[in-house]
C-alpha cells in the first residue's frame, strides 16, 4: 500500500464532521496492522482535529506543504515544509494543527494503532475511549461524568 504526498490523485473526500457543513475533509491514508499514516489537506482557516492528546499512542506530524500553526502546551508556533514534530502519549503531547495561511497546507500524521487507547480534549473536558477500529467500538464522554467503581453493579 502506498500514497504520493505531492500528487493530486487518490484523495478520499467527505463532509466531516457532519455538524460542519461545507467543510470537505480531504485525506489519503496508508495503514498496516500496527502503524498508520494519513495525509490531510487543510484549507485556509481549518484545523486537523480539536486540541487533544492521546493515551496509548504517539503521533508524528510531518509538514509536506504550506505553513500551518502548531499549538502545544508550550504555546503556538508556525511550521514550514519539512518540519517533523513528535507528540508523545500523555498531556505533554497535546497538540492542534491549524492552517492560518491563505494557501492550503498538507500534513502527514503518523501514529501507532495501540488498543485500547483514549483521546483527551482538554479544552472541552472530553475523552474518547476506543477498544476497536469500528465506530461502535468507541465512546465519548465528559470527564466530569464520574461514576464510582460499584455504581450500577449488583451487590453480593
PLM segments and residue spans:
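Short, conserved beta-strand element in jelly-roll/cupin
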Residues: 39-43, 54-71, 110-114
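Conserved short histidine dyad/triad with adjacent acidic residue
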Residues: 23-25, 38-54, 92
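A short, N-terminal "cap"/entry segment at the start of jelly-roll beta-barrel domains
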Residues: 1-34, 119-156
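Short acidic-glycine-tyrosine-enriched beta hairpin
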Residues: 73-91
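Ligand-binding loop in jelly-roll beta-barrel domains
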Residues: 89-117
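A generic structural motif
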Residues: 48, 58, 65-67, 74, ...
